[in-house]
Structure formats: C-alpha cells, structure tokens
C-alpha cells in the first residue's frame, strides 16, 4: 500500500486501513469472495474517519488546512474552469509565482480567477515561496482585478496562504502599501467578488485578495489574523501554547460564521478535501454558481453598498467589564 501523509489524530485508522489492504490483496491473489468482509471494514473505517473529523480541535483543523495534498487554486481551476488562460506580471517588473491569476469560463460565464498557490514538494514550494505573496503578487492581482472591472467579469479569489511574505525585500518594496491599496480598490470594484478560503487564510496576506461580496470557506479551512504559533509567541512567549491560541483566535468556520466574517461554510468529505478532491471541487463550483446568481442581479451601487456594510458589520464589541475575552488564563 502506498504510504500517505498521516496526521497524529488519524493513527487509530491505520490498523483498519492495513486490514482493508490485506483483504484486497487476498482478493487479487485468490478466488475467495471477501466482498462482504471488505464492505464491513470499509464502512467501519469511513464511520470512524467521519467521527474523528467531526471532533477536530482548532489546532487539528490547522493541520488539515496545511495538508500538502489539499487541493490548491490551480487544482480547483482545472476541475471546473474551461478555457483557462493564465495572465502574468504586475507590469512593474515582477511576476510572483505565489499568486496566480487569469481568465476562464465556469459554465457559460466568463470570470477572472485569482489565488494563492503553494507547491506539492520542497522544490515547488520554494518556487512558489510557500504561498506567501510579495508586493508584486498583490499588484499583479490588482492589475487583473482592474481588467475584470473594465470588462465586467465577476472575480473569484482563492485564499490559501500563511501570510504575506515578510522578508526585508518585500518590506522595501512596499508590502503593507500593496495590500492596503488592494483593500481600498476592492471596495470600489463594480463587479461581483466571491472569495473562498480553500486552506489557510493568514493575516494581511489573505485580506489582500479577500475583500468580497461573499466570503466562503471550507469546513476544515482556517482564517486568522495571525498564525496560532505567532500569537502564542507574542502573548505567552511560548510557541508550545499554539493550540490554546488557536482556540482563542476563533479561526474555524462555525466561529467565523457566528461573527459574521464568512457567509457560508462548505462541507468537506470525511478525511478532508485531500481525501476526495473532485467532490470538493463539485461543492465549490455549486456554491460559486449559486452566489453568482444572487450577485449578478444587483446594480453597481447595490454591490458596493452591500460590500461596505458587510465589512462594517463584522465582529462584535465585548464589554470591558465582562470576563468574556476568549483568551485562556
């Protein structure tokens, strides 16, 4: 059996999977009918996998969101986008590979698609800078969004980044300014914008393409102002407290839905999107088409106003005298 990437919390499934593989080998090498036994074990494994993934902690969801085989932006584009043409460059001398974009069709609709892109292995991750976009990447995204605005193409963005690249060169090139300009200009767009957190949505790197009329996220994706490791290091000077920070940050779909940050949490197959990527693609396509149907019926002033009000209404204010802080002691 080919070895697969395994989480610590998946270890209880290993023995079952080994038994299933042994029975499959027996069926291949003999004429013994083991279909009933195989069905029982596969059903049991599926049920246990579902139970495990329904009970994930925020820290465990982060692991799933970072799975190396989780479908990426280009994976989803290949699943449900026709006539995809990638567009390159920010017209200022940069073509950041950590952020990709282009035009294509979903059904009969022409759309612009932009998203962070990670790699599958070390070599590709280095080329893609681990999905951490530079100022050139965000300026490329803005150039493409201006193109979509000019030609009235709906914009779809896919968020999957630990954060914007924080290297010295990125700061010298104006990382903060590039993201800030994107935030400002995305509020002014005259076309529908749908953003989806497909993996991890970290800090300003996620926000740089995240101002949208609809913000969706997958069930085991995370969306956070800072990584739990960074938060723990800042608050407690101890990165080992990352699990506590993950719980306090409210980074999961249900928490963000209740806070009004996201509009819909998309279900994932038991085991996560890496377990059944085509199924995940079908779920995402259906959601995108459904929300586009709603948004394309709005006038420009309605789009802009609802986008503005959506962000103004996010979150809630806690009473300073209240003990409800969300932070562990």
Curated annotation (Swiss-Prot):
Q: In which pathway does it act?
A: Lipid metabolism; malonyl-CoA biosynthesis; malonyl-CoA from acetyl-CoA: step 1/1
Identify the keywords attached in UniProt to this record, alphabetized. Answer: ATP-binding, Cytoplasm, Fatty acid biosynthesis, Fatty acid metabolism, Lipid biosynthesis, Lipid metabolism, Nucleotide-binding, Transferase
Q: Which reaction does it catalyse?
A: N(6)-carboxybiotinyl-L-lysyl-[protein] + acetyl-CoA = N(6)-biotinyl-L-lysyl-[protein] + malonyl-CoA
The protein's matches in HAMAP family, at most eight in alphabetical order, are given as: AcetylCoA_CT_alpha (MF_00823)
Kindly indicate whether the keyword Lipid metabolism belongs to this entry.
yes
* Record-linked InterPro entries: Acetyl_CoA_COase_a_su, ClpP/crotonase-like_dom_sf, COA_CT_C
Which GO molecular function annotation, any one, does this entry have? acetyl-CoA carboxylase activity
Tell me, in a sentence or two, what this protein's role is: Component of the acetyl coenzyme A carboxylase (ACC) complex. First, biotin carboxylase catalyzes the carboxylation of biotin on its carrier protein (BCCP) and then the CO(2) group is transferred by the carboxyltransferase to acetyl-CoA to form malonyl-CoA.
- What family does the entry list? Belongs to the AccA family.
Q: What is this enzyme's EC?
A: 2.1.3.15
**Gene Ontology CC annotation, any one:** acetyl-CoA carboxylase complex
Give the matching Pfam families: ACCA (PF03255)
Q: Which SUPFAM superfamilies match?
A: ClpP/crotonase
Assembly information from the UniProt record: Acetyl-CoA carboxylase is a heterohexamer composed of biotin carboxyl carrier protein (AccB), biotin carboxylase (AccC) and two subunits each of ACCase subunit alpha (AccA) and ACCase subunit beta (AccD).
- List, alphabetically, the Gene3D superfamilies matched: 2-enoyl-CoA Hydratase, Chain A, domain 1
Residues covered by the CoA carboxyltransferase C-terminal domain: 40-294
Keyword Transferase included in the entry's annotation: yes
Predominantly, its location class is cytoplasm
Give a GO biological-process term. Answer: malonyl-CoA biosynthetic process
Can you name this protein? Acetyl-coenzyme A carboxylase carboxyl transferase subunit alpha
